[in-house]
């Protein structure tokens, strides 16, 4: 059997287990001839075990026969950090205004979750990446 030829890749951020065939998904998939309701059904099934509503990146590969496959990534680090310390958004002036503090344990937990998506060879390298993300949001890292 011949390998399918990929003709397009679509990147979206969609709420886990709560995707709906609305404007955002329809506008992204429609021009490529992909069935929005079919994607929504498969996406919701695959993300059913995740926290409902947490935004997750998804990369959709569209093939020449209008079929598709997709990969669900881990939630963005900023969302995991905001959830861990219970804030709505990061600081607008992260170098002067601090919005909260996060423990090293919580950062390491987030680093372990994100490890598969990060370009890091070790947990300590992943920890440094996530700690940098936290600092850029105006979140202090406990010493």
UniProtKB/Swiss-Prot annotation:
UniProt entry keywords in alphabetical sequence: Methylation, Ribonucleoprotein, Ribosomal protein, RNA-binding, rRNA-binding
Domain of life: Bacteria
Any GO molecular function: large ribosomal subunit rRNA binding
Post-translational modification: One or more lysine residues are methylated.
GO BP term, pick one: translation
Annotated function: Forms part of the ribosomal stalk which helps the ribosome interact with GTP-bound translation factors.
Assembly information from the UniProt record: Part of the ribosomal stalk of the 50S ribosomal subunit. Interacts with L10 and the large rRNA to form the base of the stalk. L10 forms an elongated spine to which L12 dimers bind in a sequential fashion forming a multimeric L10(L12)X complex.
HAMAP family in the cross-refs: Ribosomal_uL11 (MF_00736)
UniProt-recorded name of the protein: Large ribosomal subunit protein uL11
Gene: rplK
């Amino acid at each position: 059997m011949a390998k399918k030829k990929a003709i397009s890749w679509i990147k979206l951020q969609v709420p886990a287990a709560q995707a709906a065939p609305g404007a955002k998904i329809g506008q992204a998939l429609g021009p490529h001839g992909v069935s929005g309701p079919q994607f929504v059904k498969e996406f919701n099934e695959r993300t059913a075990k995740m926290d409902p509503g947490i935004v997750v990146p998804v990369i959709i590969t569209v093939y020449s026969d209008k079929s598709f496959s997709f990969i669900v990534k881990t939630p963005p680090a900023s969302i995991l950090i905001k959830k861990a310390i219970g804030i709505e958004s990061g600081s607008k002036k992260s170098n002067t205004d601090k919005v909260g503090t996060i423990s090293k344990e919580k950062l390491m937990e987030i680093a372990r979750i994100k490890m598969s998506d990060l370009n890091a060879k070790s947990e300590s390298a992943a920890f440094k990446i996530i700690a940098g993300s936290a600092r850029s949001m105006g979140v202090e890292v406990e010493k």
